[in-house]
């Protein structure tokens, strides 16, 4: 096994490609924050998942939160997203507001949202997927593997506007992702059983293609070539179908962490988001000092991810 304690302090000093003038000319990243949370909807009396909530629920949520709430692949799930936040306190206030509004709207239908990455006893084969063209295509392509995705997560976007810098920091921060996962776990139960894992969500998620830790890339051009290959061969329609633990966002100039469970405690989720933002800030400062975090073998990081 791999000792995180023995590895985490290891750094190697190495020179970046390009001159110091080129590095200095690169704009510093904004490191803005955006947080997305997925909630499962349960019946307040039975505590079971809501199999087929009325369309009026989403209508009311849209009235309350507008574009900050979206439906998900399964009808028993909704997703909220904060606005772009300049600092962590602003993101915290946004999540408090969003959680409160979802609770209030759901309560009017006899439902409640739960911030847990799996439901403790509901069965996946009883759930229905949302009827949208994108979701219908997923259901056809992924079949039963998609229907088992009765799981929720927390995604954290950090603003890194320069393309090559975004890839460079992604390569390095991969090492820390298992640590963030360990801090977030909220999914030990599945269909009425204690699975013996603190994050069974990740085991379910890994059944899909294009998941797990991403490869390293020499720069944005290499990453973009991969995306274009996948799109050109009809495997994916766009980069949003890359479901890695971390990825350059397909919609924003952000680096999106996707590995964590959703935290039942809002304060825990905010602490993890702040830690992720701080790690990227640290790695950028190291770069400015002509240093970088060591790139560890994928096998070792994968073992830490499992542990």
Residue ranges: model-predicted function:
Residues 5-11, 16, 22:
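Short, positively charged and aromatic/hydrophobic N-terminal segments
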Residues 16, 62, 119, 123, ...:
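Histidine (H) residue identity feature
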Residues 107-132, 221-224:
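Surface-exposed, low-hydrophobicity interaction/linker segments
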Residues 109-117, 181-184, 188, 284-291:
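Long, hydrophobic, amphipathic alpha-helical segments used as structural scaffolds
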Residues 30, 116, 120, 133, ...:
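Metal-dependent DNA replication initiation modules
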Residues 21-109, 138, 144-147, 205-307:
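C-terminal accessory/tail domains of diverse enzymes
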Residues 62-63, 104, 118, 126-130, ...:
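Short amphipathic alpha-helical patches
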């Amino acid at each position: 096994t791999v000792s995180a304690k023995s590895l985490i302090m290891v750094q190697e000093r190495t020179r970046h490609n390009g001159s110091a003038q080129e590095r200095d000319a690169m704009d510093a990243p904004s490191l803005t924050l955006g947080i997305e949370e997925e909630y499962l909807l349960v019946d307040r009396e039975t505590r079971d998942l809501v199999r087929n909530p009325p369309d009026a629920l989403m209508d009311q949520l849209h009235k309350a939160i507008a574009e900050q709430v979206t439906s998900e692949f399964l009808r028993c799930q909704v997703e909220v997203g904060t606005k772009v936040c300049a600092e962590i306190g602003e993101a915290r206030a946004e999540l408090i507001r969003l959680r409160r509004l979802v609770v209030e709207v759901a309560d009017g239908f006899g439902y409640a949202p739960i911030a847990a990455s799996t439901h403790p006893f509901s069965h996946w084969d009883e759930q229905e997927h949302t009827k949208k063209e994108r979701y219908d295509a997923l259901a056809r392509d992924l079949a039963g593997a998609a229907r088992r995705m009765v799981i929720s997560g927390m995604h954290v976007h950090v603003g890194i506007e320069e393309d090559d810098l975004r890839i460079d920091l992604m390569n390095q921060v991969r090492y820390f992702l298992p640590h963030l996962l360990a801090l977030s776990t909220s999914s030990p139960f599945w269909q009425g059983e204690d699975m013996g894992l603190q994050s069974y969500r990740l085991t379910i998620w890994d059944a899909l293609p294009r998941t797990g830790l991403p490869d390293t890339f020499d720069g944005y051009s290499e990453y973009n070539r991969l995306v274009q290959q996948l799109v050109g061969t009809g495997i994916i329609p766009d980069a949003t179908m890359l479901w890695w633990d971390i990825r350059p966002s397909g919609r924003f100039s952000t680096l999106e962490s996707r590995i964590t469970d959703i935290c039942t405690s809002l304060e825990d989720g905010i602490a993890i988001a702040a830690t992720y933002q701080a790690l990227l800030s640290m790695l950028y400062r190291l770069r400015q000092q002509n240093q970088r975090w060591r790139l560890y073998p994928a096998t070792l990081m994968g073992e830490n991810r499992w542990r």
